Every structure is written in structure tokens, then in C-alpha cells.
């Protein structure tokens, strides 16, 4: 009998300890009994590698899509504390999943009784991490991440006034979307590569909700983003590639033909000329661009590059 009583007491103890571990923030900040709920939408238009649908002009997520949300609480005395984050990793946001009707997460967070809450959301859920001591958000850019857009949303709420309503977040394009089209005059292209920043960071957004990107010296150390044969789209008119890049210039552009067996692809003549032209263009976050690059015949002995760049609405 005593053994059973001790076992039950130990079980209660561990449950209470678990509750304490999962609610350390709430213990430090007086909270109400009102859980924090979310309503998330996006200005996203249909782009490669996404599953978002356009329903009567309103962009919606689909079932099982995940975002991450960071939350920061500011007390009436202006003390700022990280309030919502991922269990086991305070530098990542809380994963919030769409079930087709509503957004859900666990463990639940509850509205503080006073102060304000700043919410920051990103998609995909593994795209952004947070500086340990500040609100600095950091995005690490790779050739893989360039194949998918980054969405970012901000919502600032007053705890006492807004806690009975869902937190509404509208997510915005945070990167520059660049579609590069190379017409058939360039032949069969096997690989495209260029230099890119390794990372970007921000603490603020502009009036449209787009991150104000800044770059440390280490962020500007370029890596070579390589896109192989299977990353390129082809049709009778030419070859295209769509990338989502941190704002700035495209430098170091090179392209290679399709290699023969046991050989490397050969650099296509004209790559350096394209690179020089691309460096003249600055690509802005939140904008979509269409680049068309042709080989223009000047005379029988020489060729020049004909490039058009236009900003397209989505």
C-alpha cells in the first residue's frame, strides 16, 4: 500500500515539474486564462515549390502547412522578454500547424494580463533563427533555400485590449524572386551558378512589412550557388531558372553546357558578359523580376548580349 502511495506521489511530482518546465515564461509574467490563438494569411502568389492555393483571390495555406512564430513581451515598465519560442530551442519560433481550418500549437501560451506582445512569423518553419539576446532575425541562404520563397509576418498586440481575439498575421514576401530565362540561342544548358550572400539579418520591417535586411562582413563572404540539370526548366524556347535571393546584386554568373559521359560541362561563351550585365541590376526584397537573356547577332563575326529586366506583379 505504501509503495502505491509513494508511486502516486512521485507521478504527481513529475507532472508538476513538467508543467513548471513548459510554463517558465508564464510563471515569470502574470498571465490570464485566455489562450493565444492565430489567424494567418499571405499575399503569396503561386510560385514553384509551394502548396499554397488561390481561393477567390485570397491566398490560403493548405492542411499540415507549418509556420514558426516568435513572441516577445514588453511590460508596462518596458522590460522585454522572449515569450513564445520552440521547446528546447529558444532561438527558434514555436511551430504552428494548419489543420485545414485553424492554426494549432502545443503547449498553449496564454495572454499576459498587461503589456504588449510582438509576434513574428516565418514560412517555412525552419527558415529563420533568432539571436540569443536580441530581436535580430537571421536567415541563412543556400542553393537549397533559394528554391523556395521566404514569408515574413508581424503583428503587435496590446494584451489587455486584444486577448479576446485571434492574432491576425499577414505574411509578406521577404526575398527577391528572380526568374532567369535564357533563350535557345545559348544551346543546351546543363548548369547555372552564381555567387550569393551566405546570410542576411534584420530587426525591423518597412511600412509594407518587408524586412529591412542588413549584412555583416561574414554574411557577404560569397558562396557558389550551383543549380544542376534537374533544377532547370526547359522548353522549345529556351531554359529558365527561378531563385529567391537576398536583396542586392547577382555576381559571378556562369553557365555550362550539358557534359558528355565522363566529362565536365564546358563553360558557355558569353557567361562573363552576362555576369557583367547582371551586376548592374539591384534586386529588391519583396519584388519579383523577369530576366530575359538573348544572344544578339550584331554582324557576321561577333555577338552581343541582349538582356531585359522587368519587375512583374504577382
Report residues per predicted region.
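Acidic/polar low-complexity flexible segments
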Residues: 187-233
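Short, conserved catalytic or interaction motifs in soluble domains
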Residues: 23
